[in-house]
């Protein structure tokens, strides 16, 4: 299944200038994605809007939810199943 995941945060929690938090976010998600059989197809960022978008392939919604678990403290997440056209 394909999923469109949107992550948002605000200026106060932005990781752009906090290298330790940025590494925790990126490494935490990458490791959890691999552990839960979630493949990162694409990643897009809009720095001005404090938004990151992922296209993921996963067996089910639960796998995506588990992959996001280590980074939930960094903001809000919207998980939406999608299909290719």
Task: Describe these PLM feature segments.
Residues 5-7, 54, 79:
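A structural signal for short, well-ordered beta-strand segments
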Residues 1-50, 59-62, 85:
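Short S/T/G/P-rich N-terminal loop/turn motif that feeds into the first structured element of a domain
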Residues 78-85:
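A short, structured active-site edge motif that brings together acidic residues
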Residues 55-68:
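Short, electropositive alpha-helical surface patch
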Residues 22, 70-71:
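Short, solvent-exposed amphipathic alpha-helical segments in soluble enzyme
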Residues 71-78:
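A common structural junction motif
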